[in-house]
Amino acid sequence: MKSKLRVGLVCGGCSLEHEVSLKSAIYIMKYINKRFFEVVVLWISKQGDWYIVENDDMHIDFFVNKENLHKCMPILMFSSGNRCFEYINNILSLDVIFPIIHGALGEDGSLQGLLRLMNLPYVGSDVLGSAICMDKDITKRLLRDSGLSITPFRTFLAHEKKKLKFLNFADMFGLPFFVKPVNQGSSIGVAKVNDDYSFHSALDIAFFYSHKIIIESCIAGRELECAVLGNNENPITSVCGEIIKKNDDFYTYCDKYVDHNSEIVIPAVLEKSVSSKIRSIAIRVFQILNCFGMARVDIFLFGKDRIIINEVNTLPGFTSDSMYLKLWQATGINISTLLTRLIMLALDRYYKYN
């Protein structure tokens, strides 16, 4: 009988989405097909230190208690000032890596570059696709230049902050409009602007998270999402889902992970022609941005059939509340099958291009 594939599940990380990453990893551990895969959990602490965590310890309470660190096997230590490569053979003997670190350094191409240097197959987009989709400015430019509709926006760097005037953007975009850091996920650092005070507060917040921000118009359309699965040449799409907010605000981090202050409708109530158009555009977006493995394409539906691309997430959440998983479940692919497909796609890409 063929031995199981050893999967390195990389979680945690230094980003603001550390806890979400842990929840995703725990959920993956629960549903991955253990007949086919042996999982080795590689946890990156908030300080950037790497540890191997025993599978039995994979629960949130374990990571909250710092006294549990002694139970973990150190692999690569940075916070102490030493760069110690102990137990590195445990990494090199892995068959494939499943990175589930959300946000900065995890889905922006940084971790993907490290894995490429180590010559390891890994789930999800490559360095280029990850970096593109993490930068809202670059994503929008590429989609716009490819003829797709995007939300009107302007980009600014930190040194330009003092020249930014509320009235200029109120005239340009109308009210309200959004201020966003270019490189954060889960709506972190995003603010809706209605007046001069909220504008300057939004600038402070956005520039705290990034040296580059975008200011964009607020689209009063239906908020829809479509999941994509596959490698660049043959992706498939899920049914569409809709996020219906219970208030007039945008879909915040708390809505997604804390308060659940929105209604999710899957499949979204759409005319068949509109649904097909959205799914076709999602595939085109996936290919234009050089995505591999998976992505979630977020769009606005304006009027009957005007589709505007909002954002693309190359490493969506894998928790019980995650839209990506719910979309595939409604399409007929359960999480266990989805995880297996993602791992096989990673191996297929690796052996095809290496």
Swiss-Prot record:
Q: Which UniProt keywords apply?
A: ATP-binding, Cell shape, Cell wall biogenesis/degradation, Cytoplasm, Ligase, Magnesium, Manganese, Metal-binding, Nucleotide-binding, Peptidoglycan synthesis
Q: Which residues bind Mg(2+) 1?
A: D298, E311
Give the record's cofactor note, including how many are bound.
Answer: Binds 2 magnesium or manganese ions per subunit.
Cofactor(s) required for function per UniProt: Mg(2+); Mn(2+)
Q: Which PROSITE patterns match?
A: ATP_GRASP, DALA_DALA_LIGASE_1, DALA_DALA_LIGASE_2
Please give the pathway this protein is involved in: Cell wall biogenesis; peptidoglycan biosynthesis
Enzyme nomenclature, EC number:
6.3.2.4
Q: Name one GO biological process term.
A: peptidoglycan biosynthetic process
Residue ranges of every copy of the ATP-grasp domain listed in the record: 140-344
Tell me which domain of life the UniProt entry assigns to the organism this sequence originates from: Bacteria
Q: Where does ATP bind?
A: 170-225
For Mg(2+) 2, which residues are the binding ones? E311, N313
What reaction(s) does this enzyme catalyze?
2 D-alanine + ATP = D-alanyl-D-alanine + ADP + phosphate + H(+)
Q: Which Pfam families match?
A: Dala_Dala_lig_C, Dala_Dala_lig_N
For this chain, the family text in UniProt reads:
Belongs to the D-alanine--D-alanine ligase family.
Query: What's its job?
Result: Cell wall formation.
Q: What is this protein called?
A: D-alanine--D-alanine ligase
Organism whose genome encodes this protein: Blochmanniella floridana
